[in-house]
Amino acid sequence: MSINIEQAIIHEISQDSQGQLRCRLRPQPLLNSQAVEMMLEELHQTYTSKSGKGFGYFGIHGDDGEANPAFSNALQEYRAGDLGFVEFTGQASKLLQEELAKYDFSQGGFLLMSCYTSMASDFLFVALLSAKSSMTVLDDMELSQNNHLDLSNIQLAARIDLTEWQADKDSRKYISFIRGRAGRKVADFFLDFMGCVEGVNTKAQNKTLMNAVEDFVASSDLTKEERQQCRNKVFEYCSERFDEGADIEIKDLADELADQGMESFYDFARGGSYELDEEFPADKSTLRQLKKFSGTGGGVTISFDGGHLGQRVIYDPISDTLLIKGVPANLKDQLDRRLKGE
């Protein structure tokens, strides 16, 4: 396993017959059974691989608007040993119930909370899971309907890096959370119940890094092939950091490029007007533009490796056209068959 589970628990928040939200609290942590280990390992892997996550920190009431400090205060007591895990998670469930009660759309769910260690850091994972209906075949070959936790489609989840939180009080990125579809962040109530305030614009930092890399290769004496190798190296480094759940470190990245004969990127990036943080989380979808060009519009979708530009793919900005040399075999086959049919 890639994680070492300390404790885990599930509480339920549901609606009663009058439509009021109620908490059903589990009186003891989950046993560290194989089922629990498999569930948390799957959730850890699914969460870590999610791109486009947001990052924030525990807000201060007044300085950060109406940020509620109740969750962070209870977490602090738990970490100090003044509050048990069951008591802490029970308080968290009550806070979530109170926050959910402010909205008409909420029907609750199963609140999973787990403390575990990964890559020498302690984490608190918080997720509101929903049940999903499925069918199974019984021993007598009859069909039966049952419900199971939908682990592969988590939308309301956050992870607190407890080690970073306690080691660096000025950090603004020790809480990560899943953003919703179409660029929207996770439902406000889920962040509000934890008192979380967004602190780092990850996409903006990654976009700025990409611009710095493009300016760096444009101002260098590198050949076209070497420039693409530089872009690829940056993408590979950032992808590895993303997969490990670690931050991009500009100094570390510059050292990687220096090993490939591309010196002085650190001074270039820090000396310009890029306003890059020394460390920030990776956003693979943004950085993928270093390797690929892609776009969709008007019923046309195009994607190709950056190394093909100027060779197999010729762009003419004057006539607003792309010329593709060597049409992919499967596309060529479809086009040929369509032409024959006409």
From Swiss-Prot:
It is found in: Cytoplasm, Nucleoid. InterPro entries: Nucleoid_associated_NdpA. GO terms for cellular component: bacterial nucleoid; cytoplasm. Its main location: cytoplasm. It comes from the Bacteria. NCBIfam families: PRK00378.1. Belongs to the YejK family. This is Nucleoid-associated protein Shewmr4_2217.
